[in-house]
Amino acid sequence: MGSEERTIQTLGIIGAGRLGTVLARLAASAGYQVIVAGSGAPALIAPAMRAIGASAGTISMIAAEADAVILALPLGRYRMLPAEQLHGAVVIDAMNYWWGSDGIRDDLSDPRTSTSELVQAHLVGARVIKALSHMGYQDLEDEARPVGSAGRKAIAIAGDDPVDVALVAALVNDLGFDPVMAGPLSAGIMLEPGAEAFGADVDEAQLREMLERFPTSQRGIIVARARGELPL
């Protein structure tokens, strides 16, 4: 998996729900080859994927053929992802913790770590980047705009490797949004439920302001205290 030129030509999406389908449609419209894997046999989603310019496949196919992989499945299922197959892959974590679908999970709501760091710990050897997670799927579909368009909305990105972050930023730009760097992977907690940026459908300047306000927000203080960065 991967490309020596460090560009994405084939994009894999694991998860064929609303978010995965919207991202597949946007990526296909932007000229990417898109492979989507659902929870069942590829034949079950093949007609729907063909209709939006994507193809249906398996996780194994995605691992073998895609230059980057988006995770668009319920977060509670992340341990089911095949770490060995995704070793070395650029993995874009678009998942969030929802107690309604994931159940009550203390491990997924611990302020000491972002959920993307949990995904990275499971996917040993993968290159995990947090992105495409804080905006709702309906807004993603409705708000995508060409570069330079007035009122273009922004998507935040958190990751540890500058090259991988740049790769994902280019993808976000192609999908129709201005990329905003949030910081290292641990900063992905600023994009999770409970943070101001979660659910944000705003432009680049507004999103940057939200991220800058996080340390002094109620959620930011809880996180800082849990991480030992502020006294209890």
Show which residues each predicted segment covers.
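Short, conserved loop/helix-junction motifs that constitute active-site signature segments
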Residues: 83-88, 122-124, 147-149
